[in-house]
Curated annotation (Swiss-Prot):
Lineage of the organism: Bacteria, Pseudomonadati, Pseudomonadota, Betaproteobacteria, Neisseriales
UniProt remark on cofactor binding: Manganese or magnesium. Binds 1 divalent metal ion per monomer in the absence of substrate. May bind a second metal ion after substrate binding.
Chief location bin: cytoplasm
One BP term from GO: mismatch repair
Protein name: Ribonuclease HII
Gene: rnhB
Broad enzyme group: hydrolase
Gene3D superfamilies, per the entry: Ribonuclease H-like superfamily/Ribonuclease H
PROSITE patterns for this protein: RNASE_H_2
Reaction equations catalysed: Endonucleolytic cleavage to 5'-phosphomonoester
Entry GO CC: cytoplasm; ribonuclease H2 complex
SUPFAM superfamilies reported for this sequence: Ribonuclease H-like
A GO MF term: RNA-DNA hybrid ribonuclease activity
Length: 194
C-alpha cells in the first residue's frame, strides 16, 4: 500500500530582502521526472519547466511564506519553520508522513515527520518542494525588481552581493528588506541618524 508522503523544503533563508518560502509536495506513487534534483543544481529555465510539471502531476502541493516582519520578530530559523508549517497545513490532501530537508522539524505538524540532511538531493518529494519554493521566491524577486529596478533584485535575488550592498548604500532600505540582517540593520541605523 502506498503511503502518502510529503516533501518539504525552503528557499530564501540567506537573502537580505523579501520572504522566506517553503513548499510541501505529495507526489503520485509512480512519478518520474528526469532531471529533478535539488533546485540549486538546476538552471532557472529547467527549474521553471520542472515547477510546471510538478504542479500538474502532484497529488497535492502548496507554497507558503513568512515575510520580512515575521523574520524580524521570530528570527530566520523560526520564520522558516512557520513557512514550512503553513506549506504543510495548506495541502489539500493530508500526508501520512513528511520528509523535511535539513536537521529540524517544525512544531505542531501533528503528522509523523523526519528531517533529512541534504534531503533535496536524496528524496524526490523534497526535490520537488525545493523547486517550487525556489521558483516562488524568484517570482517575488522579479516582482520586486519591477517596482525597484535600481536594486537589481532580478540579478542577485536579494543576496548580499556587491551590487545589492551598493544599491542599499545609494538608495536606502526598502520596507521589504530584512531589518534584522546585519548589512540592512547597520544601514537602517545610519539612515535613522539623518
Amino acid at each position: 500500500m502506498h503511503i502518502l508522503t510529503a516533501g518539504v523544503d525552503e528557499a530564501g533563508r540567506g537573502p537580505l530582502v523579501g520572504s522566506v518560502f517553503a513548499a510541501a509536495v505529495i507526489l503520485p506513487e509512480i512519478f518520474d521526472l528526469p532531471g529533478l534534483t535539488d533546485s540549486k543544481k538546476l538552471s532557472e529555465k529547467k527549474r521553471d519547466a520542472l515547477a510546471e510539471m510538478i504542479k500538474n502531476q502532484a497529488v497535492a502541493w502548496h507554497v507558503a511564506a513568512a515575510g520580512p516582519e515575521e523574520i524580524a520578530s521570530l528570527n530566520i530559523l523560526h520564520a522558516t519553520m512557520l513557512a514550512m508549517k503553513r506549506a504543510v497545513d495548506g495541502l489539500a490532501v493530508r500526508p501520512e508522513k513528511i520528509f523535511i530537508d535539513g536537521n529540524r522539524i517544525p512544531e505542531h505538524l501533528n503528522i509523523p515527520a523526519e528531517a533529512v540532511v541534504k534531503g533535496d538531493s536524496k528524496i524526490i518529494e523534497i526535490s520537488a518542494a525545493s523547486v517550487l519554493a525556489k521558483t516562488a521566491r524568484d517570482a517575488e524577486m522579479y516582482a520586486l525588481a519591477q517596482r525597484h529596478p535600481q536594486y537589481g533584485f532580478d540579478k542577485h535575488k536579494g543576496y548580499g552581493t556587491k551590487q545589492h550592498l551598493e544599491a542599499l548604500e545609494k538608495y536606502g532600505v526598502l520596507p521589504e528588506h530584512r531589518r534584522d540582517f546585519a548589512p540592512v540593520r547597520n544601514l537602517f541605523a545610519q539612515q535613522a541618524l539623518f
